[in-house]
Structure formats: structure tokens, C-alpha cells
């Protein structure tokens, strides 16, 4: 960020994005050997990212056990949504605060909040304590996701960020897929409380490592009053209110209330209007430091890539939430087995992302990975429409491999060009916007296919001869009953079982067809991304700094001064 004494002038002038220069003969940067301290920090960041990603879905397979133990069957959805809501709403707030209070402070605070929330969840004796703990966890998790990306961006040049983003993305992908397996294993073999307690020692080790080694620059930020005046309070309130209202609507739609009911439509409309008001407020001339400055969307490359990131995240959650419906309702897999059957995505997206990142670092070219990723995801989503009860293991594994490679390459290749199209002073806000939009996309990546699926099931349900079973599946019931137990309970009546499975297949086919449309939209948007030069010099006021033994001078290789 600009120096504080120049902040007002810089913001009033609304700094222009970096020129979108065409990439011609972009030489390979000289290799920069990283210190042991750099790698200790990076490993600690990767560990905390793993924990934050783990807790987005680790309770999915253990939720029945948790709700039965706490007696919270009617409020089970809040155990999931409290984390999602809190993490999404606080991401841009952490990004803005990082410019005011420094990266190190906000990173440590995020890990501490997450650890506190984990302890509260593990020790919960009632639903209120569990939901509250999950909300605290979500605040910390959102902070961890934001700060991990920002800190990495401050430690390496834009040219190198693809490689490190690929590693972080790989960690995220692995955590998201193994989480349901871990959750089920803890709930069945030890105790569901260890789903949360396991975070404490790992977070503790990361906290110590970050506290000892994460020494970053922090420009003077003035008095406490001056710091508080820089916070975008109005924008924060609008954003939190908007996200809360939208998450409520999407959580209720198709489950507790019909999508056409006022209980769903009213909060959704209010949330979307509040989101529009938030962006309008971000352009207010009196606003000193917006939470999400409109200049982030001021050039074709950054604005297009933010939309692409939204679509990519939407598709990732789309597939990871609805392939298990196929595995459990059609293949009759258990929840834990279903989670294992998703491993091909994690096992391919992680190495594909790292490979794409390394290639971007060496060549400076990233557009090819956007096209490659969306082509592979389009092929995969098209092939998913062919899955049926007789599909072999090779089919659903092979289709997932295509999707995994595609999603891994797109994840790694979006943030570096966004940052390349903007000034270095916008690293924190741009990274926060990118992370927020990805999280926001994940919310819609569950809601849209759920609405499509439920609508198609309602159309196909008349084919079911048993009126009782039919009533269980319509109006959102099909997703709830997409379980091994329910399908096996129909085995005494093979004809009825076949009818039910066929209804599920018809619903899923339309889900995959609509996902293909989003894949094609993402592919088309790739043409609007320009080839920019990825800067190979590190120019930041918050960078990492190595101390030389017996010297007050600091090495200029990795940053500025200590925070």
C-alpha cells in the first residue's frame, strides 16, 4: 500500500491499474534461492490453509452423529452454514485490515480465532455452543485463507506466485476431498469431538512458527484513532448483511422452504440489493480506503479474471457436491466411501496446479492454462451426463481426472495476472477480492445445481409408482434421501428401486448439462484476458526481510524491514 502520509492523496486520485502490456519475448527470471526461514513460514501457512480448508467439509459425514449427540436435528444446517457465512463475509475485512495493522498481526489473529473456535466446537454440549463455535471458526478460517494468499504474494514476485499458489491450491484440494473421510473416521472410531480437537496441536505448531519467523515490514499507520478512521465501516456492514441474507436464502431454498416461497425470495432479493449497494458505496468520493475498491474492476483483464474465478469456484463445488449424489443414490456407496470415490479430483488437481504454476514461473505465459482448464472441465462435465448405474469404475475415475486437471490449472493461473494488471499497492485488496469472489462462487456452486436438480426431480417423479416414495423425493427431498440406506431400503421392490434410480439419473443429467453451460461461458471469457508481463521484481512495503548475522543491515533479496 502507499505510505500512510500519502494515502489520502493516492486514494483521491484513484490510482490507475498497471498498463496492460502485451507479452512478447518474456525472459525467464533468474532463480531466487529461498532461505530456510522462508520455507518454515511457507510450510506453516500451508498447514493453516489445510486446517481452514479441512473444516469447510469435514463435518459433512459426521453431521448425523453430531446432531444426534447434541439433539440439534432441526438446526443441523446452521452447523455448516455458520462457518461458510462467517468465513465469506470477513475475507475482504481481513484484507483491508492487513494494510492498516500489518500482515503479521492479522495472520496471527486469524490463527488464534480459528483455534479458539475449534476448541469451542470440540467442547460443545449444546447446539448454540456448536453453532457459535463454528461461526468463530469461520471468522478465523476466512482470515487464514485471505492472509495466507496475501503473505505469499508479499514474499515472492508475481512471476513466481503461480508456483506457490499451485502448492497452496493443492493443499486446499487435498484437504477438501479427504475431509469427509477424516470426519467419518473420527465419528465412527474415536469421537466426533476430535474432528475439532485435532486442529489444536497443528494450529499451535503453525502459530509458534509464524510467531517466531514471520517478520514482515509494516509502514507506520498512525495513532489508534487514525487507524480506526481508515476502516470502511459502512462497506463492512453492507457486505456482512448482504452475505448473511444471501446465505440464508440459499440455505433455506429447496430444503426448509420452496424456492418460490417468500421466505427464500425476500432474503435473496434483500441480499442482492445490499450487494449492489455495497459496490455503489465503494465508489463514494468521501471513502478513504474502500474494502473492495472499484479500481480492481477497472481493467479488462482483472475484471474478467475475477468473473472466471467465480465460475471456476462455482464449478468445483458443483461437481464435488453432486458427484456424491451419484455415488450414493446410484452406486449405493456409503458417505465415507463416496468421499473416497472423489479422490481422483484431489489427486490430479493438486499436481496439475503445481505443474501449471511452475510453467508460468518459467515462461510467464498463463492464458494457455485458462483455455486448457476450461476445455478439460467442459469435456468432463459433458461426459458426466453419460454416467448411469452400469458405468464402470474406469469411467467415473477417468472423467474426474479430466476435471481435476482442468480445475487445478485454472486455480493456479488466475491470481498472478490479476495482480499483474494492478499496482503493487493493491496486492492485499485484490487478493482479498479474489478470495471473497471464490468463496462467494462456492455458495452458488451448491445452490444453483440444487435448484436445477430439485426442479428436474419434480418433473420426473410421476414415473415413480409408489406415492409414498414419490412424496419423499419431490420438493427438495431427493437430495436429502440420496443415501445408501434409502436406496437399499427399496431392494425388496426391484422395480420401484429402478424407478427411483432413474429419477436420480435424470435429475443429475440436467445438473451436468447446466454445468457444461457454465464451463463454456468460462471458456469464452478466456478470450478477453490479455497477455501481460508478470513482474519478476518484488516491490512491496510488507515484504519478508532476512537479517544478516551481526549486522543491522537487511538483505534486499526478499523484502523491506521488520514488522
Curated annotation (Swiss-Prot):
Residues 1-30 are annotated as: Disordered. The keyword Zinc-finger does not apply. It comes from the Eukaryota. Signal peptide: none annotated. Its main location: membrane. It is a multi-pass membrane protein. One of its GO terms (molecular function) is transmembrane transporter activity. Coiled coil: none annotated. The chain crosses the membrane at residues 39-59, 75-95, 105-125, 138-158, 167-187, 194-214, 233-253, 261-281, 305-325, 340-360, 368-388, 401-421, 433-453, 509-529. PROSITE patterns: MFS. Pfam families: MFS_1 (PF07690). Keywords: Glycoprotein, Membrane, Transmembrane, Transmembrane helix, Transport. This is Efflux pump FUS6. It comes from Gibberella moniliformis (strain M3125 / FGSC 7600).
Amino acid at each position: 500500500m502507499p505510505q500512510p502520509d500519502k494515502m489520502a492523496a493516492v486514494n483521491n486520485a484513484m490510482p490507475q491499474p498497471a498498463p496492460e502490456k502485451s507479452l512478447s519475448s518474456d525472459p525467464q527470471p533468474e532463480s531466487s534461492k529461498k532461505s530456510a526461514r522462508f520455507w518454515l513460514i511457507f510450510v506453516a501457512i500451508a498447514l493453516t490453509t489445510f486446517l481452514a480448508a479441512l473444516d469447510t467439509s469435514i463435518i459433512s459425514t459426521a453431521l448425523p452423529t453430531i446432531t444426534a449427540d447434541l439433539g440439534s436435528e432441526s438446526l443441523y444446517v446452521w452447523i455448516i452454514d455458520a462457518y461458510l457465512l462467517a468465513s465469506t463475509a470477513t475475507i475482504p475485512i481481513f484484507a483491508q485490515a492487513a494494510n492498516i495493522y500489518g500482515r503479521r498481526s492479522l495472520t496471527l489473529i486469524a490463527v488464534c480465532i480459528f483455534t479458539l473456535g475449534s476448541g469451542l466446537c470440540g467442547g460443545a454440549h449444546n447446539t448454540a455452543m456448536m453453532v457459535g463455535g463454528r461461526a468463530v471458526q469461520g471468522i478465523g478460517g476466512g482470515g487464514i485463507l485471505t492472509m495466507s494468499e496475501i503473505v505469499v504474494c508479499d514474499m515472492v514476485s508475481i512471476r513466481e506466485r503461480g508456483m506457490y499458489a499451485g502448492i497452496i491450491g493443492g493443499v486446499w484440494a487435498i484437504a477438501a476431498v479427504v475431509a469427509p473421510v477424516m470426519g467419518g473416521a473420527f465419528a465412527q472410531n474415536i469421537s466426533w469431538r476430535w474432528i475439532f480437537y485435532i486442529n489444536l496441536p497443528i494450529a499451535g505448531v503453525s502459530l509458534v512458527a509464524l510467531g517466531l519467523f514471520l517478520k514482515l515490514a509494516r509502514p507506520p499507520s498512525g495513532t489508534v484513532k487514525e487507524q480506526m478512521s481508515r476502516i470502511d465501516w459502512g462497506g463492512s456492514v453492507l457486505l456482512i448483511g448482504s452475505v448473511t441474507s444471501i446465505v440464508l436464502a440459499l440455505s433455506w431454498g429447496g430444503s426448509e422452504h420452496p424456492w418460490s416461497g417468500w421466505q427464500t425470495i425476500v432474503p435473496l432479493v434483500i441480499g442482492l440489493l445490499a450487494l449492489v449497494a455495497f459496490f455503489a458505496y465503494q465508489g463514494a468520493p468521501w471513502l478513504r480506503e474502500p474494502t473492495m475498491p472499484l479500481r480492481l474492476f477497472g481493467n479488462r483483464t482483472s475484471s474478467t479474471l475475477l468473473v472466471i474465478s467465480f465460475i471456476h469456484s462455482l464449478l468445483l463445488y458443483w461437481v464435488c457436491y453432486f458427484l456424491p449424489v451419484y455415488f450414493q443414490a446410484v452406486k449405493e456407496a456409503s458417505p465415507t466411501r463416496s468421499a473416497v470415490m472423489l479422490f481422483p479430483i484431489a489427486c490430479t488437481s493438486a499436481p496439475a496446479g503445481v505443474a501449471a504454476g511452475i510453467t508460468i514461473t518459467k515462461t510467464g505465459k498463463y492464458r494457455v492454462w485458462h483455455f486448457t482448464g476450461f476445455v478439460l472441465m467442459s469435456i468432463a462435465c459433458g461426459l458426466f451426463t453419460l454416467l448411469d448405474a452400469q458405468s464402470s469404475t474406469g469411467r467415473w475415475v477417468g472423467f474426474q481426472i479430466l476435471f481435476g486437471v482442468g480445475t487445478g490449472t485454472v486455480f493456479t493461473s488466475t491470481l498472478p495476472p490479476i495482480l499483474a494488471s494492478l499496482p503493487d499497492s493493491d496486492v492485499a485488496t485484490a487478493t482479498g477480492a479474489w478470495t471473497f469472489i471464490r468463496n462467494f462462487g462456492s455458495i452458488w456452486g451448491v445452490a444453483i445445481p440444487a435448484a436445477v436438480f430439485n426442479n428436474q426431480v419434480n418433473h420426473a417423479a410421476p414415473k415413480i409408482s409408489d406415492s409414498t416414495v414419490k412424496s419423499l423425493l419431490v420438493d427438495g427431498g431427493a437430495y436429502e434421501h440420496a443415501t445408501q440406506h434409502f436406496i437399499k431400503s427399496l431392494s425388496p421392490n426391484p422395480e420401484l428401486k429402478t424407478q427411483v434410480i432413474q429419477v436420480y439419473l435424470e435429475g443429475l443429467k440436467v445438473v451436468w448439462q447446466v454445468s457444461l453451460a457454465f464451463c463454456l461461458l468460462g471458456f469464452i471469457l478466456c478470450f478477453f484476458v490479455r497477455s501481460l508481463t508478470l513482474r519478476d521484481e518484488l516491490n512491496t512495503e510488507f515484504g519478508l526481510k532476512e537479517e544478516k548475522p551481526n549486522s543491522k543491515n537487511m538483505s534486499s533479496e526478499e523484502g523491506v524491514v521488520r514488522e
